[in-house]
Swiss-Prot record:
This is Laccase. The keyword Metal-binding applies. Its EC number is 1.10.3.2. It holds the Pfam family Cu-oxidase_3. The lineage of its organism: Eukaryota, Fungi, Dikarya, Basidiomycota, Agaricomycotina. It catalyses: 4 hydroquinone + O2 = 4 benzosemiquinone + 2 H2O. CDD domains: CuRO_2_Tv-LCC_like, CuRO_3_Tv-LCC_like. Cu cation 3 binds at residues 111, 400, 452. Keywords: Copper, Disulfide bond, Glycoprotein, Lignin degradation, Metal-binding, Nitration, Oxidoreductase, Repeat, Secreted. It is an enzyme of class 1 (oxidoreductase). Binds 4 Cu cations per monomer. It comes from Trametes maxima.
Length: 499
């Protein structure tokens, strides 16, 4: 692991995680990038050095540290043209932010176009020396992080606008495509009798994965950096950008067991060891498992997740019992997604810079129709009714700068105002289920915060809005470094072929 102070050098390099070689965007030479780690209370100083040379995968970049509140450092959140101009090739930019009150499992990824699909993504863990769950596990280290990623043999800009599935699923950076079932699989080692805190991170650009380990139950203790009451399950459907910590008790016979991560579309199943990795007990032979998948009898259901420590839900316990309720009406026209009639097109001037330059109202902020101005210290409710008008469901939605209470989950018609889970990415479900996923949060963090579908191809198609929170206080609460102010003039001077 690297951090909390680290250089992250971004380059193009050939990589063959599934036996097929292609150019990718790598961090310090690898994809997924290295684990970034620190402790609660740390100041992270992450210097991103742009040495990219391949315009097909973009030469500019911008990195989002997913799940961090960035209170007072909205400029360090990362989304290109929301919070900053991209970093230009041959330049670097220091992301310098404090993590005073968050711990758990996070990740980082490019937040420029579809660049993270080409490899710029990796896990991020903030440890809590006083973790309330500490007595439940014996091991929690670099080797207990499990990343899931969809991998494509074609660069995102050269492939279809909306791919019909990945070529391979990578578990900890290794996997197999159906075309080559001899590629090496990841091996995760355990010692019989020990309890492991595994941190499952979806680095996905598109599919959700149903994750399971043959012969073992998984006890969930953390959801997107929020501690949860322990919940025992035998499979976890994890959507793009979500994270779960689960405890695995290595109490089975010494052997090899299949680890499975089945995508919801594309190359599904496990023939030839696709969508798989290996759980190997110490003392087991170095061979592939022969275990069989059993039917899941206790799959994760989001409504069964509850905060470890009682957390009040913003607003009052009734539908619309908030200071401001917003409905997000989805649409699609064959090439672009729309929310309430607007498809998000990145503005040439980042939204934060517009605010710092004096723009205050939704009418003044660009892109027109995509910026929602929220009052300070208010309870906000957002509903996302699933609709056949927005294909590619379920759409996982992510709000930057916050965790939110999921008062109505996908697959449920119940509103829970007493003990719903708080998280930062939520599945908005399917029209077939009649879903109307509803979230609540408090505006306690001034700045423009992106709210978008985390299927990166859908985001590229405009499936996003900006929540501009407490606009009058943004300038005073988010002083920007000179290096940030220099990003836009440098970027704007690039030739198109250097963007």
């Amino acid at each position: 692991a690297v951090g909390p102070v680290a250089d992250n050098t971004i380059t193009d390099a050939a990589t063959s995680p599934d036996g097929f070689s292609r150019q990718a965007v790598v961090v310090n030479g690898v994809t997924p990038g290295p684990l970034v780690a620190g402790n609660i209370g740390d100041r992270f100083q992450l210097n991103v050095i742009d040495n990219l040379t391949n315009h097909t995968m973009l030469k500019t970049t911008s990195v989002h540290w997913h799940g961090f509140f960035q209170q007072g450092t909205n400029w360090a959140d990362g989304p290109a043209f929301i919070n900053q101009c991209p970093i230009s090739p041959g330049h670097s930019f220091l992301y310098d932010f404090q993590v005073p009150n968050q711990a758990g499992t996070f990740w980082y990824h490019s937040h420029l176009s579809t660049q993270y699909c080409d490899g710029l993504r990796g896990p991020f863990v903030v440890y809590d020396p006083n973790d309330p769950h500490a007595s439940r596990y014996d091991v929690d280290n670099d080797d207990t992080v499990i990343t899931l990623a969809d991998w494509y043999h074609t660069a995102a800009k050269l492939g279809p606008r909306f791919p019909a599935g990945a070529d391979a699923t990578l578990i900890n950076g290794k996997g197999r495509a159906p075309s080559d079932t001899s590629a090496e699989l990841s091996v995760i080692k355990v010692t019989k009798g020990k309890r492991y805190r595994f941190r499952l991170v979806s680095l996905s650009c598109d599919p959700n994965f149903t994750f399971s380990i043959d012969g073992h139950n998984l006890t969930i203790i953390e959801v997107d950096s929020s501690n949860s009451q322990p919940l025992s399950v035998d499979s976890i459907q994890i959507f793009a950008a979500q994270r779960y910590s689960f405890v695995l008790n290595a109490n089975q016979a010494v052997d090899n067991y299949w680890i499975r991560a089945n995508p919801n579309f594309g190359n599904v199943g496990f023939n030839g060891g696709i969508n798989s990795a290996i759980l190997r007990y110490d003392g087991a032979p170095a061979v592939e498992p022969t275990t069989n998948q059993t039917t899941s009898v206790k799959p994760l259901n989001e409504v069964n997740l509850h905060p470890l420590v009682s957390t009040p839900v913003p607003g009052s316990p009734s539908s619309g019992g908030v200071d401001k309720a917003i409905n997000m009406a989805f649409n699609f026209n064959g090439s672009n997604f729309f929310i309430n009639g607007a498809s998000f097109v990145p503005p040439s001037v980042p939204v934060l810079l517009q605010i710092l330059s004096g723009a205050q109202t939704a009418q003044d902020l660009l892109p027109s129709g995509s910026v929602y101005v929220l009052p300070s210290n208010a309870s906000i409710e957002i509903s996302f009714p699933a609709t056949a008008a927005a294909p590619g469901a379920p759409h996982p939605f992510h709000l930057h700068g916050h965790t939110f209470a999921v008062v109505r989950s996908a697959g449920s018609t119940v509103y829970n105002y007493s003990n719903p889970i708080f998280r930062d990415v939520v599945s908005t479900g399917t029209p077939a289920a009649g879903d109307n996923v509803t979230i609540r949060f408090l505006t306690n963090n001034p700045g423009p915060w992106f709210l978008h579908c985390h299927i990166d191809f859908h985001l590229e198609g405009g499936f996003a809005v900006v929540q501009a929170e407490d606009v009058p206080d943004v300038k005073a609460t988010n002083p920007v470094p000179q290096a940030w102010s220099d990003l836009c003039p440098t970027y704007d001077a690039n030739a198109p072929s250097d963007q």
